[in-house]
Amino acid sequence: MKTKTYLQQLVTSLKVNKFYLLPYLIVWLMGLLVVLLYDKIDIHQFTNQRPCGIGDSLFPYITKLGETFPFIVGGILLLFHLRKALFVLSVQVVGAIVVYTLKNLFRARRPRIVFQELGLDLHTIDGVRLHAWNSFPSGHTMTAFAFFLSLALIVKNKLLKFFFFAMSLLVGFSRIY
């Protein structure tokens, strides 16, 4: 029996996961287009100035999926599926290193500071602590996307893949809500 090379495994994984990766690529390209066409402040203000009670209630919990939750799940997987757990945890660690490096490189101010300096109102949610620096890239969003992507690559169920895609989008949106 011939062992597949890493490149062959990657190509196979990309083919098998096209139902997750294609929508992700489309959303990423749409987001890139919006960022290229519109000012960052206008985008944030458009999103932020349309609060709703459900969003105010749910997004503080959804955003937590981009914190320690992925590492806890990775640790639990470690108890039962060593290879899968190591994959999930390694994706998280690599992502965290990349985000930490980029945050320190860009040192972007967070919307709270920018809006305050411009005299603009910023809708906030009670109980959610707002920081001042290192806004870009979003660690929560990266953690969630990396986590849900790694899970989508592991599972075979297409409905679960779609669920993971939707959850990663919700966490990302919760960061600008």
Language-model-detected regions and their locations in the chain:
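N-terminal transmembrane-helix/juxtamembrane module of multi-pass inner/ER membrane proteins
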Residues: 1-71, 103-129
